[in-house]
Amino acid sequence: MPALGRGWSVGTEVEFEHGGTEVAVEKETEETGEFEQEVERGGEVALEQFWVQKSFNKHLNVRAGHIVVPVGMTNNGHTPNMFFSVYRPEGEKTIMPCTWHETGISVWGKAGSWRYEAQLLPGLNSNLFNDQGWIHNGSASPYEFRPANALACAARVDWSGIKGLRLSLSGYLGGSNNNDIVTDPNGKYYKYNAVVAIGAFDFAYKNQWLTVRGNVDYGHLSDAAAISARNKNQTTMTGNPYPHTFVGEGAWDAAVEAGVNMLAWSKTKQKLYLFGRYDQYDSYVPADGLADIGWCARTVVSGGVNWCPIPEVAVKAEGGVRLLDSQYNDEPFFALGVTWTGFFIH
């Protein structure tokens, strides 16, 4: 985060997509509105954060640009040294955008043991909501730009008044209907707001021996039955980006993980954590009149090892099982990962 002087600074986070995973969709209005997929962006550099900040004092800072939305534990701490699992915690990354980043403005500051942040952002796109991931895809525009016909706000408060302990509340509120490149003011679904409301609590406790983290998230979508009907009847034209599924009126997640540092007794600066993790979530709580979808409720139990030879590097191994309703097969898994997290500050 280079400092520019007089309280000005700039920050950025860059992601290198080597696999050609980024594909853009274009809507050709002169060709009967057909969708075309363009792969020119594939394999390019993705910009996850880029902002300019003015700091007046520790109590008041104003940040504008492409910023992270700190709703939930994982979005607030999305670097791999902030969780034990090889992949990002499953519940939060399933039901919410993760890492959630938007172009907007943020006001934040600190006072004693408290830290606050409030943001003004573009709303999500309910055309991209689905049963498997609730609003997860709502912030990731398939186009080469991000429509912003609706506004939203997010906020977070952290308290760290006890050594090693952090308690946090965060939330989000914003409309999501008619926030696409094409809207129909005369259509039967135009009148709905499809307001997304999320409330989240998370905590972390860390000392020399023990690290414990946990979170509870609940989200509600107004007009979910109407949005589900609209999404099921979206265009099926070749190349369209829409999932064509129902979307839940609600979604929730609760998770906890704990790790013991087996090297805490020694003089080494290395860390070797043995950890366990429990995650339960449901990405589809149906609106009245809509049937439940059993496989959307999942429980994940896992455990493993994190070895940190230096603070920036973690070698991770994790094994576990994803438990579903009795009519579905449970899903055992094993994962290995090597992570590096570093910050360049000038």
Regions found by a protein language model. Name each.
Residues 75-78, 129-131, 181-182, 227:
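Short aromatic-enriched loop/helix-cap "lid" or pocket-rim segments at secondary-structure transitions
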Residues 1-126, 149-154, 158-167, 249-250, ...:
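Outer membrane beta-barrel
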Residues 126-128, 133-180:
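Loop-centered beta-sheet repeat module
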Residues 38-39, 92-94, 140-144, 244:
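Active-site rim elements
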Residues 29-40, 50-53, 164-346:
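Outer-membrane beta-barrel pore domains
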